[in-house]
């Protein structure tokens, strides 16, 4: 596996010097300063590449070239946004960058209710509390029809939860959900959020799939011609929320994507934390089934709670993900590719990390503090090395 590290650009509290000291060789980043839908120019791409090269690092994966909301809803200037996306892919390829992660989640990227969930050891994790989210939908956002998504018992629990909240807690929960987490390119006020949700009225699962299919048919041929590996990120959490459809949550969704545009350049970011939230997702089977289309991996573990729709982020080698089996499957695919002549390892990054030790005293991007990810990367590296030394000696020699 190629060991990479997510970096949010010059304003990231974690510096490129820190990244090198963590042992990563590749960087996963994006041009966050360019508005969604606009072309990434060769000049801007080369500028970012030069920043990384000056620190002895390479730009391994783009995460992400954002998909404009008008592409997802097929409204406004969506065809122009697609044309701009195509040109950004060509420009990235011209600059030698060949792996692009993206997602097709409506309105919000990843969603959490608590960004400072305190674990028994005193470190902090990200959490999605289903009842807290219900309280937001039913009593803060007051989304029409939201009650249809919750049982009577969940509605009662949400009402109790909301009644016990202070104004400060209401503001914090609202901000956690709609203000934009790291990697999200847009944040909203409550009124803006309601308006954005309304843009999806009449767009169900089938319609959003149709729109994704159109997008794929437009961009995959460009990716093929340019030598770009597209890697769609799964929904997080992997189920419908806020009355919005989700189209990349299960093995059936992966199968649909492959069949819709059957090209090796139409692939996946295999995020164990996102897919792993669902107990009915067999991660190893999913990975092995679509191994040849996995172009990028996010390795982290989540812990499902008593309410199966609630979860928090666990340590990388704990929780509901069998990380040893996952890395074993990744290495098996790398060996297959190596024998077929493709010697490039699959880029991997330690996804998220607990806020811990000295980082508890610092301002950090939620989920992206340095020390927790450093710990995760070291653990994942150890698993990989042990497997290479025992089961994948050919890769070790390679």
Curated annotation (Swiss-Prot):
Enzyme category, top tier: lyase
Annotated region (Disordered), positions in chain: 342-362
GO BP term, pick one: D-glucuronate catabolic process
UniProtKB keywords: Iron, Lyase, Manganese
InterPro entries the record matches: Man_deHydtase, Xyl_isomerase-like_sf
Record field: catalytic activity: D-mannonate = 2-dehydro-3-deoxy-D-gluconate + H2O
Cofactor: Fe(2+); Mn(2+)
Any GO MF annotation of the entry: mannonate dehydratase activity
Pathway assigned in UniProt: Carbohydrate metabolism; pentose and glucuronate interconversion
Keyword Oxidoreductase: no
Coiled-coil region: none
The keyword rRNA-binding is assigned to this record: no
This enzyme's EC code(s): 4.2.1.8
Task performed by this protein: Catalyzes the dehydration of D-mannonate.
Family statement drawn from the similarity comment of this UniProt entry: Belongs to the mannonate dehydratase family.
NCBIfam families noted in UniProt: PRK03906.1 (NF003027), uxuA (TIGR00695)
Name listed for the protein in its UniProt record: Mannonate dehydratase
Lineage: Bacteria, Pseudomonadati, Pseudomonadota, Gammaproteobacteria, Enterobacterales
Encoding gene (name): uxuA
